[in-house]
């Protein structure tokens, strides 16, 4: 049964008891839940041990004359739905509990004006300061490992990511794709204000964005042409009054003029009134190639499959294992005790790692601080140290940032245990490659026999693999999990070639879509 807390003291006491040793996810909402919120909650429940749903209609983000008083509220319905989805806790504080003064006399978080004074912020002064203030309070109160936000509120998402970066907050921000009705209308609590006729009229927003997306896919990079394509569709529905239509950099929200950049994702954002209801929508125009994320337990054949998929598609194999080996080598080279985590963090935080892709069957080359260590990272001493280093939070944070940097341009295939859930949660194609414990043990036994080692017991191998699975799936940092949107491939009765071909066909199917 879902627990409901109205006070900070009650929630924090519960989290200290029930959340000890568990991953905590936060889904901040203003209530009146719809399918878009449902997608956030489902993903959070799938990925986190304990999920907190906050319901708070934030007065700080409503301006004079906006719909604060009539904003839809349905706490009983929200509670029932949250419980059915497996949410552990609802935090529904009062204005007083969150320290909001009627006179506005409270500490306020002020994100960069360049991000808050464009798009919606240009028409809703103070809105994003109100959002940032309450979200920061929620992060401080709940201390979540991951917070989930919808991509529909793209400006809010970009500002919160910047807030987390600038304030050195430890929470990970995870975005989830916009959920739409069959008509294409983006899910919103305000959709219930619309009459049936207005709801039909509102579908023009997404159709207009799709028109620009089509031009973009055809190679048009001129801002004026893309805006014209959108406006032509909007003009066919004169009852919809556009407040703004703009192309901005997706991360910084800076307006773009002239020609779109090829490197960075671009946000096409729109706000319009349908009757008296204000709606927003957006699409990201991204020139990068897709990313394939392959996860799975040890012994499932991920490394071999991933490399062959990359070769077969002409993509880059992102050897994340080589990155961890590189840092393990650096720690050994500098004489740092592996168990001295502060010293490890100090050393590795400033390390420069560069991968040097090589054609199969050569292993990936690596430079550390400009030094080629491609052979040095393959020694037994480094191999023995890798798992110890990989379990440290500072090391994982360092390499997570580096891996995502490689992913900025796309066109990569990466494998691991948390690639689709942690490193590239928005990868276009996610694969969970697995096999039974018995099958993986048989494969391992064949490897040992091929090396001339005949004194290996199959039953012991099975026990070792099962134990490794348990450790990987229950570790505190980035546990092995199947992403909710991953395609599972069980390889017990498949050859490597068959698995590779299956993944390549899935990739081609995605590209056609």
From Swiss-Prot:
MF term (GO), any: CMP kinase activity
EC numbers on record: 6.3.2.1, 2.7.4.25
Biological processes annotated in GO: nucleobase-containing small molecule interconversion; pantothenate biosynthetic process; pyrimidine nucleotide metabolic process
Region (Cytidylate kinase): 284-513
Binding site for beta-alanine: 61
Keyword field: ATP-binding, Cytoplasm, Kinase, Ligase, Multifunctional enzyme, Nucleotide-binding, Pantothenate biosynthesis, Transferase
Domain of life: Bacteria
InterPro entries named among the record's database cross-references: Cytidylate_kin, Cytidylate_kinase_dom, P-loop_NTPase, Pantoate_ligase, Pantoate_ligase/cytidylate_kin, Pantoate_ligase_C, Rossmann-like_a/b/a_fold
Region of interest: Pantoate--beta-alanine ligase: 1-283
Location in the cell: Cytoplasm
Residues involved in ATP binding: 30-37, 150-153, 179, 187-190
Coiled-coil ranges (or none): none
UniProt: (R)-pantoate binding residues: 61, 156
Biological or metabolic pathway of the protein: Cofactor biosynthesis; (R)-pantothenate biosynthesis; (R)-pantothenate from (R)-pantoate and beta-alanine: step 1/1
Cellular component terms per the entry's GO annotation: cytosol
Catalytic activities: (R)-pantoate + beta-alanine + ATP = (R)-pantothenate + AMP + diphosphate + H(+); CMP + ATP = CDP + ADP; dCMP + ATP = dCDP + ADP
UniProt main location, coarse: cytoplasm
Active site: 37 (proton donor)
Function: Catalyzes the condensation of pantoate with beta-alanine in an ATP-dependent reaction via a pantoyl-adenylate intermediate. Catalyzes the transfer of a phosphate group from ATP to either CMP or dCMP to form CDP or dCDP and ADP, respectively.
Protein family membership: In the N-terminal section; belongs to the pantothenate synthetase family. In the C-terminal section; belongs to the cytidylate kinase family. Type 1 subfamily.
Protein name: Bifunctional pantoate ligase/cytidylate kinase
Organism of derivation: Synechocystis sp. (strain ATCC 27184 / PCC 6803 / Kazusa)
Gene for this chain: panC/cmk
């Amino acid at each position: 049964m879902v627990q409901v807390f109205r006070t900070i003291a009650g929630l924090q006491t519960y989290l200290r008891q029930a959340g000890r040793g568990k991953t905590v996810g936060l889904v901040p909402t203003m209530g009146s839940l719809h399918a878009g919120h449902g997608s956030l909650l489902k993903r959070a429940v799938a990925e986190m041990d304990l999920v907190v749903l906050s319901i708070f209609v934030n007065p700080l983000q409503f301006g004079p004359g906006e719909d604060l008083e009539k904003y839809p509220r349905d706490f009983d319905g929200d509670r029932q739905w949250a419980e059915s989805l497996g949410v552990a806790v609802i935090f529904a504080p009062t204005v007083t509990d969150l320290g909001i003064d009627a006179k506005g006399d409270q500490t306020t978080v002020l994100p960069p004006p360049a991000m808050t004074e464009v798009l919606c912020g240009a028409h809703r002064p103070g809105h994003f300061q109100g959002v940032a203030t309450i979200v920061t309070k929620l992060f401080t109160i709940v201390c979540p490992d991951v917070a989930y936000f919808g991509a529909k509120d793209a400006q809010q998402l970009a500002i919160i990511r910047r807030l987390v970066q600038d304030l050195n907050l430890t929470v990970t921000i995870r975005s989830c794709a916009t959920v739409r009705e069959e008509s294409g209308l983006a899910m919103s609590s305000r959709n219930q204000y619309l009459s049936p006729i207005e709801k039909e009229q509102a579908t023009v927003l997404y159709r207009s964005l799709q028109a620009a997306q089509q031009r973009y896919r055809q190679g048009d990079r001129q801002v004026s042409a893309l805006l014209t394509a959108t406006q032509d569709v909007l003009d066919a529905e004169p009852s919809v009054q556009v407040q703004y239509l703009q192309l901005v950099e997706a991360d910084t929200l800076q307006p773009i003029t002239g020609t779109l950049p090829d490197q960075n994702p671009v946000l096409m954002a729109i706000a319009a009134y349908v009757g008296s209801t204000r709606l927003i929508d957006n699409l990201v125009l991204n020139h990068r190639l897709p990313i394939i994320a392959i996860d799975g337990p040890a012994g499932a054949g991920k490394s071999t499959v991933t490399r062959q998929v990359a070769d077969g598609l002409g993509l880059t194999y992102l050897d994340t294992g080589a990155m961890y080996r590189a840092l393990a080598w650096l720690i050994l080279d500098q004489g740092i005790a592996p168990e001295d985590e502060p010293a490890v963090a100090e050393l590795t935080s400033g390390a420069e790692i560069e991968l040097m892709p090589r054609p199969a069957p050569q292993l990936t080359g690596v430079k550390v601080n400009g030094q080629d260590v491609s052979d040095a990272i393959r020694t037994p001493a480094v191999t023995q140290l890798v798992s110890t280093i990989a379990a440290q939070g500072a090391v994982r944070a360092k390499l997570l940032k580096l891996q995502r940097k490689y992913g900025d341009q796309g066109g990569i295939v990466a494998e691991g245990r948390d690639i689709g859930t942690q490193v590239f949660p928005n990868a276009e194609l996610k694969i969970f490659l697995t096999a039974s414990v018995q099958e993986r043990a048989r494969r391992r036994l064949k490897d040992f026999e091929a090396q001339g080692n005949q004194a290996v017991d199959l039953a012991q191998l099975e026990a070792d693999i099962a134990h490794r699975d348990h450790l990987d799936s229950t570790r505190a940092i980035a546990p092995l999990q199947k992403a909710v949107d991953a395609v599972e491939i069980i390889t017990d009765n498949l050859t490597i070639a068959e698995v590779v071909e299956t993944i390549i066909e899935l990739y081609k199917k995605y590209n056609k879509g």
